[in-house]
Each structure stands twice: as C-alpha cells, then as structure tokens.
C-alpha cells in the first residue's frame, strides 16, 4: 500500500487495535472470575460476580460488530479523524459501561446510553458519506468541498 492510502486509514486501524486489546482485557476478566469460582474449568453459571462479568462481556461483544462497521464506514466515506475520535470515545464509554456493570447496574446506564449515541453519530457520518458519494455521482458536486469552503470563511 502506498503512504497516502495508509494515511487514510491509520487512525481507524489504531482504534480497531485498541478495541481488540480492550476485548482481550474483558475476556481476561471473565476467565479470571471463572477461575476464582470454579478452579480450572469454565462454566457459564456461578456466583453473582461471575454472572455480572460474563454478562457485561457478552453485552460488549454483541455490540462490537456494529461498532466496527460504522467506525470504518464513517472513516472511509466521510472523515477519518472525527470517526477515529468518536471510536476512542466509544471505547472509553464501553470501559465505563463494563466497570459500571460490575458494581451497581445503574452505574452502567450512562455508559450504555452514551455508547448508543456515539454509534448513532458514526452511523450518521456514514450516511453523510454515502449521500456525498451520490451527489458526486448524480450531480457532479462534492458536498465536502462546500463544507470546507463554508468552514474556512
């Protein structure tokens, strides 16, 4: 790949790799809690602490494909920097959700709600990128250039 192509996706790749490390951390927490409870064997049921860790991890895993899809679509079709920033914010919020779920379940609610809003923001960025592509294709006008012109004045 040439440097320009790598430059267009490097921030998205960094956020993706950070999310992989975070998933590993969550899985390690589940494994650690399972070993504390059952010795060496892994079971899905057990103490309340294990149930909370397992459920929090499962909830994060369930939302992960959606996050990756909208992160990369928003970054490639709209703008890499805001998409990567929103992706980092989502990872912080997901960490807050995970840790909050281990305590009182009401502590996880702000992380959950803000995470949904970040996913919506990335989705809207993706739609804006698709709309811009359609405008270029149909009318030959680039919406992104209009935004840059307006924002520099």
From Swiss-Prot:
GO molecular function: arachidonate binding; enzyme activator activity; glutathione peroxidase activity; glutathione transferase activity; leukotriene-C4 synthase activity
Ranges per topology, Cytoplasmic: 31-52, 103-107
Gene3D superfamilies in UniProt: Membrane associated eicosanoid/glutathione metabolism-like domain
Pfam family of the protein (one): MAPEG
Major site of localization recorded for this protein: nucleus
GO biological process terms held by the UniProt record: leukotriene biosynthetic process
Membership in a protein family: Belongs to the MAPEG family.
Protein name listed in UniProt: Arachidonate 5-lipoxygenase-activating protein
């Amino acid at each position: 790949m040439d440097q320009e192509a790598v430059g267009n996706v490097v921030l998205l790749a960094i956020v993706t790799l950070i999310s992989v490390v975070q998933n590993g951390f969550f899985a390690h927490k589940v494994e650690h809690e399972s070993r504390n409870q059952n010795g060496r064997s892994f079971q899905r049921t057990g103490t309340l602490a294990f149930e909370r860790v397992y459920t929090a991890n499962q909830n994060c895993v369930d939302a992960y494909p959606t996050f990756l899809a909208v992160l990369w679509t928003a970054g490639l079709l709209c703008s890499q920097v805001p998409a990567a920033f929103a992706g980092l914010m989502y990872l912080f919020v997901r960490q807050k959700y995970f840790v909050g779920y281990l305590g009182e379940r009401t502590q996880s609610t702000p992380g959950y709600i803000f995470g949904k809003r970040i996913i919506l923001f990335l989705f809207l960025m993706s739609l804006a990128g698709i709309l811009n592509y359609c405008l270029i294709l149909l009318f030959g006008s680039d919406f992104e250039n209009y935004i840059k012109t307006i924002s520099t004045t």
